[in-house]
Amino acid sequence: PSAGPTRAVEELYDCQADPQDLNNLAKSGKHREILKRLRTEHVRHITATADLGFLPESEAWELFSKQTGWELGQAGRVPLAGIHQAAAQVGVASERVFLKNLDSDNPTIRYWGAIGLAVRPEISGMAKRKLRRKISDPSLAARIEIANALATHGDIPNALPALIDSMQHENLIVVTHAARIIELLGKKANSAKYAIEEALKRADKIRPADTPATVVLPGDKDLAMFVSFSCRAFLNKLDE
C-alpha cells in the first residue's frame, strides 16, 4: 500500500497468500469470524498477562519505583481493564467518549482520551475548549498528549507552553515525550527552538554527541540519546 501518515486501526493479513502483507483483510466480510476470534484472543492475552504496555512510560517507571512491573501486574494493583478499553477506543470511538475519558480519575485513561482526540480528523470547538481547560493536567504524560491534541487541531499558542515547560523537566522520559511531539510539529513549533536547543545541550552533556547509538548506556545516558534524536531532527527541519 502507499505510505501514509497513519495506519489502519486493525490489520489482518493472509501471510501465506500475501507474504508481503499488502492486502489488509480487516474489513473483509469473508474474514469477519477470523477477525472476531483474534480480537477475543488479544483481549484474553493482555488480560491474562496483565499487559502494562498501555501505560505511558513516565507513569510506568513511577509505579515501578518500589515494585517491579511483574509484581504490580500479578497482584492486580493496576486497574488495567479500563486502561485497555480506553486504548482500544482510539481511532474507533466518538468524540464524546474521548471527552468523557479526559474526566477520568485515572491519569492513563486521560492520556488515552487525549490521544483519541489527537488522531481524529477534526474535533469540535467544545472539544478544543475542554482541552484548553485540561492543559494543566497533573499527569505529565496526559498533559503532553492534551497539548499534542490541541496542536494537532491548530491551537499551537495554547499547546506550546505546556510542551516547552515539559522540556525542562528533570525526568528525561518526560523530556523525550515532549521533544518528540515538538519534533513532529516541525516549523509550526518554531517558538520552541530555544527550549529544544537547551534540551540538546543538556542531552549532549549527559551523553556526548559522538557516542555511537549502538552503545547502550544505563539510565539517563541512554535516555539522553533519544532526547538528542528528536531535538536534532526538529532543528534540522527548521533549517530546511
Range-by-range predicted roles:
Residues 1-27, 33, 56, 62-65:
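C-terminal, low-complexity/hydrophilic appendages and adjacent surface loops
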Residues 4, 36-37, 44-48, 57-101, ...:
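Extracellular/periplasmic ectodomains of large secreted or surface enzymes and adhesion receptors
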Residues 17, 43-47, 187, 201:
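Sec-exported extracytoplasmic/periplasmic mature domains
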Residues 30-33, 37, 108:
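Generic recognition of stable, solvent-exposed alpha-helical segments in well-folded globular domains
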Residues 76-92, 108-123, 133, 141-156, ...:
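Structural detector for internal amphipathic alpha-helices that build alpha-solenoid repeat scaffolds
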Residues 91-103, 122-136, 155-168, 188-202, ...:
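Amphipathic alpha-helical scaffolding segments comprising HEAT/armadillo-like alpha-solenoid repeats
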